[in-house]
């Protein structure tokens, strides 16, 4: 295994771990995720908060695939994979999901605690934590609402997704979840 591959694996696991650690230590009632690469500006978070507290949904999920993106924001292969997973998740979860891997998500802490308590149901192999949260939210009967954002070019860091390696892993997770949700 190359050093670059090892570092990418550490970063992915670290991202998932840091989100979980932050959520565990949070003292407020509302939990928010915003990726550090600033592809979504922090100024968008009040829209997510408003959608949650107004009761529009229980789990507010960012969507990068509605508005035109800046030129370098997402590679074509990633865009195609995102659209595939969106269709698969919409069918699988029985509610429309337009973007499964947007890092911007907002939910109630009490709902997250229920998701975390039942995480074992889908396994603990999600390298980024997005599928884990979406599967858990659907399993807990939460209303997932997509909220479009304007996706920008990365201003910090590099992508942590290795499209083929992680794409295959995410596909395996979706198939596993399909057996747990649709064919129980």
Residue ranges and their predicted role:
Residues 1-8:
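Acidic donor-binding segment of Leloir-type glycosyltransferases
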Residues 9-25, 30, 42-123, 127, ...:
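Acceptor/aglycone-binding surface of glycosyltransferases and processive sugar-polymer synthases
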Residues 38-40:
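Acidic metal-phosphate-binding loop of nucleotide-sugar-dependent transferases
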Residues 122-123, 134-151:
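Catalytic donor-sugar/metal-binding loop of nucleotide-sugar-dependent glycosyltransferases
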Residues 129-131:
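DNA-recognition element of transcription regulators
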């Amino acid at each position: 295994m190359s050093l670059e591959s090892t570092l990418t694996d550490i970063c992915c696991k670290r991202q998932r771990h840091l989100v979980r650690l932050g959520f565990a230590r949070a003292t407020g009632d509302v939990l928010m995720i915003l990726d550090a690469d600033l592809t979504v500006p922090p100024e968008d978070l009040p829209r997510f908060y408003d959608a949650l507290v107004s009761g529009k949904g229980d789990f507010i999920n960012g969507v990068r695939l509605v508005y035109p993106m800046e030129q370098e924001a997402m590679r074509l292969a990633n865009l195609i994979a995102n659209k595939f997973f969106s269709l698969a998740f919409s069918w699988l979860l029985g509610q429309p999901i337009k973007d499964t891997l947007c890092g911007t998500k907002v939910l109630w802490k009490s709902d997250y605690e229920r998701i975390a308590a039942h995480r074992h149901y889908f396994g603990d192999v999600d390298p980024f934590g997005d599928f884990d949260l979406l599967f858990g939210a659907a399993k807990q009967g939460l209303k997932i609402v997509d909220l479009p954002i304007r996706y920008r070019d990365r201003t910090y860091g590099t992508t942590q997704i290795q499209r083929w390696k992680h794409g295959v892993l995410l596909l395996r997770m979706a198939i596993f979840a399909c057996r747990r949700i649709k064919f129980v």
